[in-house]
């Protein structure tokens, strides 16, 4: 079905262990803003539709199978407009709060989304991308006046189905998703062939399949492995340590992939990384 962005307000979303962090760059963020702004000005169609948000029902939240990047970017746009345009909490203007994003293995990211501190942005790769996206949003809005900001926000958060609204394709897998393995399989299939996912991130998803663990310790082991994976990645992102262990000229979006290349005996190529 289709949902207005306004319909997502007040919801709680949970990003499971098999997913990597936020990785959109400034170009992708600004392209989304341009598209929404173009729709705001022209409104040649009844609604502007984002790519699917794929979810399953959790206990008190929606588990995100696919669409984390889009959900996070919209969150950051609304966070900026709340702070710099409305200058008051969204709940005061719209009687409902901004939706919440929680992470199974990176709970500190939930707090960082509230502060978006420049000082902390170099602490890990997730903060780096989140802060970069927020700065791109600030830059994009820098030449917009109050009325233009208001138009943009009114379009983004249009309430009724009769208004020109921004919508997402909402795909609820709850009835089909008997276990975590099915969600991981869907996640992998949806992302094969997409630029954002690296080989290492697909390997991570496969490692965390429920069938790899005994039933009594499945969740504990999944969380432990996902946490250790993130710790390794953060260590590899430290410039001094990275240059100590490698002299490769190849650029890795996720540096743990270098370890897999070593294990496989993969020779370096000079193809550009995209």
Task: Place the predicted regions along the sequence by residue.
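Covalent nucleotidyltransferase
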Residues: 1-274
């Amino acid at each position: 079905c289709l949902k207005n962005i306004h319909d997502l307000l007040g919801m709680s979303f949970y990003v499971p262990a098999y997913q990597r962090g936020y990785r959109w760059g400034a170009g992708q963020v600004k392209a989304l803003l341009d598209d929404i702004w173009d729709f705001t000005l022209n409104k040649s169609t009844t609604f502007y539709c984002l790519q699917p948000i794929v979810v399953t029902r959790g206990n008190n939240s929606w588990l995100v199978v696919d669409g984390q990047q889009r959900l996070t970017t919209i969150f950051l746009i609304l966070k900026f407009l709340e702070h710099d345009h409305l200058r008051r909490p969204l709940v005061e203007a719209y009687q409902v709060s901004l939706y919440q994003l929680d992470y199974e293995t990176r709970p500190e990211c939930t707090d960082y989304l509230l502060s978006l501190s420049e000082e902390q942005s170099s602490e890990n790769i997730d903060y780096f991308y989140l802060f970069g996206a927020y700065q791109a949003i600030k830059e994009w809005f820098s030449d917009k006046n109050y009325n233009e900001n208001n138009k943009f926000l009114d379009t983004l958060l249009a309430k009724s189905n009769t208004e020109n609204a921004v919508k997402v394709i909402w795909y609820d897998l709850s009835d089909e998703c008997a276990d975590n393995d099915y969600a991981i399989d869907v996640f992998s299939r949806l992302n094969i062939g997409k630029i954002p996912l690296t080989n290492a991130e697909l390997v991570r998803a496969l490692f965390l399949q429920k069938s790899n663990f005994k039933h009594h310790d499945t969740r504990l082991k999944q969380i432990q492995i996902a946490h250790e994976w993130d710790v390794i990645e953060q260590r590899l992102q430290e410039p001094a340590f990275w240059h100590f262990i490698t002299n490769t000229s190849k650029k890795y979006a996720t540096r743990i992939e270098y370890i897999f290349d070593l294990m496989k005996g993969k020779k370096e190529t000079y193809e550009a990384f995209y």
